[in-house]
Amino acid sequence: MDIKVMEYAAEIARRQSFTKAAEHLHIAQPSLSQQIKKLEAELGLTLFHRSHGSVTLTPHGRRFIEKAEDIIRSRDDLLREMQERSQGIGHKLSIGIPAVTGRYLFPPLLKQFLARYPHVEVQLVEKDPVSLEKMTAKGEVDLSVLSLPIEDERLSITPLLTEPVVLAVPKEKQRWMPPELVALIEKALEEDEGRQPCVPIDMVRNVPFILLKEGFGFRRTVLDLCAESGFKPNAAFKTSHIETAQSLVANGLGVTMAPNMVRRDKDPGVIYLSIQSAPSRTLVFVFLKNRYVSLTAQAFMELSRESLKQTFDEGCLGNKDENI
């Protein structure tokens, strides 16, 4: 059985169309169809249901594609490893990143990496964390940067950064604010930045809360922190962007929790308060278990950890021993 035919079958399954697969593979559709018929005859099994132009996998087909993709990945891993043993750092690296991490954390890291390895072509894949976890588990990207917890047991993790979770609240007094929160904000405005008071999470139990939508790892972090204090946040708004959440806070529409890296200290409408018990979130590199981790990926992970260790001091990183 030719591995090339496995690749043909996998592409048909991926695109659910012989026509689209043939276009992508740059071969004639009749030739592609004939190759698959020969494969099915060799196996004595039907791999694809063909009906009115649509193509779906049979149960036998699903199993075949699952194993075929494992074989293709193993072949690709072997070729990459042998190439790197011969030539050193490779030429391509694909990295999955959520939008916020990509916007705030990655630009300086990429600048340093490409300055050291200018020949490497880096492909950034920006998706929501749930999609990135699935893509990484399928081997569709070399690695991703996500926040704990990681649920897929097929994935390995390497810690990158632990940072505090802070509470963003309006600077101006709002009708919905409990007196103790108002007093805490007033005290914080009077203190130096390094001496600001901490807020108990329970203090925002009944205030309007701005949450990220489903599918964001940081949303899970916030819900877990609130659950540990015995309450579910009163969600006034849900958004896909942490910047939008902070803007809503600045306009007095509620409070939100945010990773320390995204705080907007120059925003005149928002003040950031430390939270009692020093909750944190941990960013990790995520990659597929039992798969060759390229020298290129290893180099990027090592440079990133070194760079962030120099950039963030102990106060920025928070409690390094506490994972969420």
Swiss-Prot record:
Residues 1-58 form the HTH lysR-type domain. Residues 18-37 bind DNA. PROSITE patterns: HTH_LYSR. GO terms for molecular function: DNA binding; DNA-binding transcription factor activity. GO terms for biological process: regulation of DNA-templated transcription. Keywords: DNA-binding, Transcription, Transcription regulation. One of its GO terms (cellular component) is protein-DNA complex. InterPro entries: LysR_subst-bd (IPR005119), Tscrpt_reg_HTH_LysR (IPR000847), WH-like_DNA-bd_sf (IPR036388), WH_DNA-bd_sf (IPR036390). It comes from the Bacteria. Belongs to the LysR transcriptional regulatory family. This is Uncharacterized HTH-type transcriptional regulator YcgK. It comes from Bacillus subtilis (strain 168). The lineage of its organism: Bacteria, Bacillati, Bacillota, Bacilli, Bacillales.
